[in-house]
Amino acid sequence: MVFAARLFLFVGFLIAPMLRSVDIAQAQIVAIGASNVAGRGVSSSDAWPAQLEGMLAAKGRNVHVTNAGISGDTNAGMLARLDSAVPQGTKIVLLDRRGGGWNARRRGMGDQNAELAAIEARLRGRGIRIIPMWWNAALRQYLQPDGIHFTVEGHRLVATNMLPAVMGAVR
């Protein structure tokens, strides 16, 4: 599992520069997902989307990252609210591919792969670039006592590891 995650990240970072970049003046970025996007258990300014926005600003990328995470959301829920959560003009979506599926599996709901495929197809159909939220087994040591949600440091690690892919997507 760790090997697969590392391989996914390695391949993603290799191809990121080859993918279409978005002009910074037109960049609107939306992070969508469940509680680890929303920042459950930490302040909104400590959630990874806000930290990522700050890191982008420090690198001279003055873009806004909208946090459209909802604690307890499922992939079906994300699909249902996709058009309102990701407004017209959005160029990049940072997609939590795990949290919503975890919530639904825990409740015995839906076909997670089909729902994720539908989310991605709808976003691509609108010309929106998708960057998956970074996950790694190393994050386990940065979870709150509930064993599910990131600590502030966990959020910082997610933002730090997503930064290169997002930097490659906005110029």
Predicted feature descriptions by range:
Residues 21-27:
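Boundary at the C-terminal end of the N-terminal hydrophobic targeting segment
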Residues 28-42:
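Catalytic nucleophile-elbow at a beta strand-turn-alpha helix junction centered on a G-D-S/GDSL motif
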